[in-house]
Amino acid sequence: MKIEDKLVTSVISGLKALYGQDVPAAQVQLQKTKKEFEGHLTLVVFPFLKMSKKGPEQTAQEIGEYLKANEPAVAAFNVIKGFLNLTVASATWIELLNEIHTDAQYGIVSADENAPLVMIEYSSPNTNKPLHLGHVRNNLLGNALANIVMANGNKVVKTNIVNDRGIHICKSMLAWQKYGKGETPESSGKKGDHLVGDYYVAFDKHYKAEVAELMEKGMSKEEAEAASPLMNEAREMLVKWEAGDPEVRALWQMMNNWVYAGFDETYRKMGVGFDKIYYESNTYLEGKEKVMEGLEKGFFFKKEDGSVWADLTAEGLDHKLLLRGDGTSVYMTQDIGTAKLRFADYPIDKMIYVVGNEQNYHFQVLSILLDKLGFEWGKSLVHFSYGMVELPEGKMKSREGTVVDADDLMAEMIATAKETSQELGKLDGLTQEEADDIARIVGLGALKYFILKVDARKNMTFNPKESIDFNGNTGPFIQYTYARIRSVLRKAAEAGIVIPEVLPANIELSEKEEGLIQMVADFAAVVRQAGEDYSPSGIANYVYDLVKEYNQFYHDFSILREENEDVKLFRIALSANIAKVVRLGMGLLGIEVPDRM
């Protein structure tokens, strides 16, 4: 039983005994005592002054005396104005640690068969280039969010919508056709997504050269862009694709398959995955159908040019285009089509879209349209909106010199982690295979933690060098502390020390030890809050605060060399449960923690 729950029950009994009145539990406010005051938990007594008919200090004194006499969990109390500060007994903290120790998945709530089904969409790449730094933040946030939502007792389906059609895809197809000379991932030794991305860049290069040449002949920029033979060929290819031209479709399928193989490798390295992948080529026609259905029902209207629109002025928005006059779709049409397919595939209770904040308006509109079209979860659609991520100027430029590929970023992080770990002696005594694995865990952990510790709504700068520091609020600092605790536990096991199911309760704990138990116990509430707020950063910063406190404890107190056997057992058990919570917390963020370093 939580200490807070125990104290709330005793306060209710005390108010009945002292003032003869029943009080609902919701009226009893307990909060953590401020650091400058003595105590662990503070009771606000102002709500009880009417029934006590006394001043706040006297009321607090009377309640404190009652609790001290009748509730074994209260060791002492002090009164500051209208606040009653309660010091929890050491035996009660040890009892709480015993409860946490018996729960291998402390703080994690499993879904039962009646749990709500939450679908989370993230990644959403285009099949004309590799995943880049922006996708890294998206994937890491989406994956962590899915883990956190699942840890709060929900069923979760992780989905991805791949933008696999359109003019941008035709650009890389046409460039490969013109300049590729039959090059394949196998013949070039390149990942498929990188190879296709190179042809997208090649298209852009040739197109710009064409435009410049036409402008030299006297055309304006707009005229030159419209007259570009290369761009017109790409448009023709798109028309052929829409018409189902077998040759164009075969080329499209071949090049997309190269990209998917590349994406799969990137996702695997990054440690993210999906339960279901949707493709825009399958959803956009469904969207058209659903929009026409909405038109027939009078939800939408048609303009003279044949385009279909939604009038959202009643919702405080404007008119929104859903189908162009030539019948071609827009992004909104695709999202409606994808929603239709998803609704047919799964009994969704809530849908969360992990998409950058430049799409805030789009999702506001989508929510209204889905609701109009009869999707029950339309109103409860969540747009998990996040800010942009950049690199410090001049760092890690990609081959194109503009965007940083996810693969290059991860490779550089792993290489830097290996170099830094070797310099600090963290890989001493390990085999080559073990050292490589530690470098991978630390490099990716540094990347993931640095991104996830930041409030998702904020724009951020990812600093590779800063992220691999073994000191401060970083992934490697947390990972090293975890490895340190695992080393303590290994030595304890080698010495034949076994943590009992019930720890001796006859020891006096220090303030630091009580504080650490309180922090470990907080993990369940932190996971719950992160689920309510959709906040991976809440988990990240909690774990950092916990390991920072543990490091101070590790330096200030003997653990294995402690002479009092009961105290030694307690400190080993405390260390084991801190390691457990760190592993669970980092696991929710998709970050591995090494057993040794």
Curated annotation (Swiss-Prot):
Lineage: Bacteria, Pseudomonadati, Bacteroidota, Bacteroidia, Bacteroidales
EC primary class: ligase
Keywords associated with the record: Aminoacyl-tRNA synthetase, ATP-binding, Cytoplasm, Ligase, Nucleotide-binding, Protein biosynthesis
Matches recorded under SUPFAM superfamilies: Anticodon-binding domain of a subclass of class I aminoacyl-tRNA synthetases, Arginyl-tRNA synthetase (ArgRS), N-terminal 'additional' domain, Nucleotidylyl transferase
Encoding gene, per UniProt annotation: argS
HAMAP family to which the protein is assigned, alphabetical: Arg_tRNA_synth (MF_00123)
Main location: cytoplasm
Pfam families: Arg_tRNA_synt_N, DALR_1, tRNA-synt_1d
NCBIfam families, alphabetized: argS
Subcellular location: Cytoplasm
Motif 'HIGH' region location, chain numbering: 125-135
Cited PROSITE patterns: AA_TRNA_LIGASE_I
Molecular function as annotated in GO: arginine-tRNA ligase activity; ATP binding
Biological process, per Gene Ontology: arginyl-tRNA aminoacylation
Biological source species: Bacteroides fragilis (strain ATCC 25285 / DSM 2151 / CCUG 4856 / JCM 11019 / LMG 10263 / NCTC 9343 / Onslow / VPI 2553 / EN-2)
Protein name, per record: Arginine--tRNA ligase
Catalytic activity: tRNA(Arg) + L-arginine + ATP = L-arginyl-tRNA(Arg) + AMP + diphosphate
SMART domains, sorted: Arg_tRNA_synt_N, DALR_1
PANTHER family, per database record: ARGININE--TRNA LIGASE, CYTOPLASMIC, ARGINYL-TRNA SYNTHETASE
